[in-house]
């Protein structure tokens, strides 16, 4: 599956709401939630400070928008459309293609990752919402696929260990975005490279799943 570059969030930057989100993303990622004032954000966006209340309710609402909206359609939404009962190789390809799609947004991803790292150090509670709305649905879908593969219950700890390991391959391209850009920038240089990356990660994940199957057979846990 070859996909074109996703339109960047800033492509709609003439919209006043989008201008506020982009200004907030930059300032929150640079200064943190406490360090960036609503006045400063409004000035950077060329907006009246009252627009923050109008569009987002308050500073916390603006922070939540900056935390996730620039990534575009949430990967969790795309993953929800994947049929976990289809052949495993097809499901894995669809999963990684959806998961990696935000990388096609370029610089905005770098700023979002910077903000996410800052959130880990200076927590505001935004991660709790992200886990519930984005990460948990992805994890549950992958666990369902793997549990079905091994005729195992969804609370099987080894299935969960494998699911976390599989998705960890893709997560690195987000949290290690700057590192990858230094060590091997060609891997995420353009939409075609990202599509190829999704295909390769699906291939690697299938090998990991086969290895887990071999372990289960050797221990008499699966036929």
Labelled PLM ranges:
Residues 2, 128-136, 145-202, 214-221:
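Hydrophobic/aromatic-rich alpha-helical bundle segments in the mid-to-C-terminal region
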Residues 79-112, 159-166:
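Hydrophobic alpha-helical connector segments
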Residues 14-22, 55-79, 128, 132:
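An amphipathic alpha-helix adjacent to DNA-recognition modules
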Residues 107-132, 177-183:
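Amphipathic alpha-helical segments used for helix-helix packing
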Residues 59, 66, 70, 92, ...:
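Hydrophobic/aromatic residues within well-ordered alpha-helical segments
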Residues 1-15, 26, 214-223:
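N-terminal intrinsically disordered/low-complexity leader segments
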Residues 19, 27-61, 65-66:
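Helix-turn-helix
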């Amino acid at each position: 599956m070859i996909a074109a570059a996703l339109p960047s969030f800033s492509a709609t930057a003439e919209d006043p709401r989008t201008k506020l989100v982009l200004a907030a993303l930059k300032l929150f990622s640079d200064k943190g939630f406490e360090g960036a004032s609503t006045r400063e954000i409004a000035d950077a966006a060329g907006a009246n400070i009252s627009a923050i209340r109008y569009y987002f309710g308050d500073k916390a609402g603006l922070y939540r928008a900056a935390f996730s909206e620039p990534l575009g359609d949430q990967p969790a939404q795309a993953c929800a459309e994947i049929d976990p009962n289809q052949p495993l190789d097809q499901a894995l390809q669809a999963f990684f293609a959806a998961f990696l799609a935000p990388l096609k947004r370029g610089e905005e991803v770098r700023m979002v990752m910077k903000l996410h790292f800052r959130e880990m150090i200076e927590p505001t509670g935004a991660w709790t919402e992200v886990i519930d709305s984005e990460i948990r649905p992805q994890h549950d879908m992958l666990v369902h696929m793997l549990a079905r593969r091994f005729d195992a219950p969804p609370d099987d700890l080894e299935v969960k260990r494998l699911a976390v390991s599989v998705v960890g391959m893709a997560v690195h391209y987000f949290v290690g975005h700057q590192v990858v850009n230094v060590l091997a920038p060609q891997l995420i240089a353009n939409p075609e490279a990202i599509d190829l990356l999704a295909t390769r990660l699906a291939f690697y994940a299938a090998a990991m799943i086969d290895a887990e199957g071999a372990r289960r057979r050797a221990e008499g846990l699966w036929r």
